[in-house]
């Protein structure tokens, strides 16, 4: 699992970009970066440069049943230090994300299971509900330069009836603000998931923009995949 995640405060203001990597035990112990990891990290570095938002690299071992600590990585030097989970909370707190813990705060175990990773259990429990956090799902490049960020949504709701849910507006607001800071286009892209046979139908896509100033989504267009990939859509 590799994620580029934007974290913000309770006002949906972007504060930190974090690359979260769940590695095998072999890569974790040897601090070896895969080609995919290097690509994701480099994209995060560029996003940090153009948005002005700091970025951090965090890696944990997905093969361990319990999570006590993570690798806190300096990408430039390829050096890292293992930090306990309560110390990681203080890193986030410096950016106004979550609650500042005391030096004597107990380090807990966080368990990996098939449903949810230990890292995300830690995030929910320690950083709390007064934050916003959202993955960067898809980035568009034109002439080797980033031009857009897309939030991907899917469900079994027919494409002509689906519209963004208000429960997701906080995340849309966070990512659209981040995209604005980076001078990138932001769109919500929906595809329908079929039940029989079970598959994601991406032959047709429905696009929405999101105005974080007015906290509302606006329908843009419904296009075939080829037109989407070539940027041929309204809005």
Where are these regions (language model features)?
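Conserved catalytic cores of phosphodiester-cleaving nucleases, focusing on short active-site segments
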Residues: 3-42, 136-140, 144-159
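Acidic-basic catalytic patches of nuclease active cores, encompassing PD-(D/E)XK
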Residues: 3-11, 43-55, 60-133, 235
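Surface-exposed cleft-lining segments at the edges of enzyme active sites
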Residues: 24-31, 109, 119-127, 155-163
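Short, charged, amphipathic alpha-helix that recurs within catalytic cores of restriction-modification
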Residues: 30-60, 161-181
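Nucleic-acid nuclease catalytic cores
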Residues: 47-71, 176-205
């Amino acid at each position: 699992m590799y994620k580029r995640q934007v974290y913000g405060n309770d006002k949906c203001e972007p504060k930190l970009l974090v690359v979260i990597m769940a590695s095998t035990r072999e890569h974790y112990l040897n601090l070896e970066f895969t080609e995919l990891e290097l690509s994701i990290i480099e994209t995060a570095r560029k996003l940090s440069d153009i948005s002005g938002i700091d970025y951090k690299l965090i890696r944990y071992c997905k093969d361990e049943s319990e999570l006590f600590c993570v690798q806190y990585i300096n990408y430039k030097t390829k050096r890292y230090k293992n930090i306990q989970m309560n110390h990681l909370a203080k890193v986030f707190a410096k950016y106004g994300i979550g609650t500042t813990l005391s030096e004597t705060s107990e380090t807990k175990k966080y368990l990996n299971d098939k449903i949810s990773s230990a890292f995300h259990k830690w995030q929910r429990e320690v950083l709390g509900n007064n934050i916003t956090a959202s993955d960067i799902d898809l980035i568009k490049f034109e002439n080797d330069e980033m031009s857009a960020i897309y939030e991907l949504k899917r469900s079994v709701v027919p494409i002509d009836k689906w519209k963004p849910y208000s429960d997701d507006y906080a995340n849309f607001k966070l990512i659209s603000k981040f995209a604005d800071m980076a001078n990138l286009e932001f769109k919500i892209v929906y595809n329908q998931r079929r039940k029989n046979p079970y598959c994601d139908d991406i032959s047709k896509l429905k696009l929405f923009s999101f105005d974080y100033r007015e906290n509302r989504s606006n329908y843009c267009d419904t296009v075939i995949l080829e037109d989407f990939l070539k940027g041929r859509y309204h809005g």
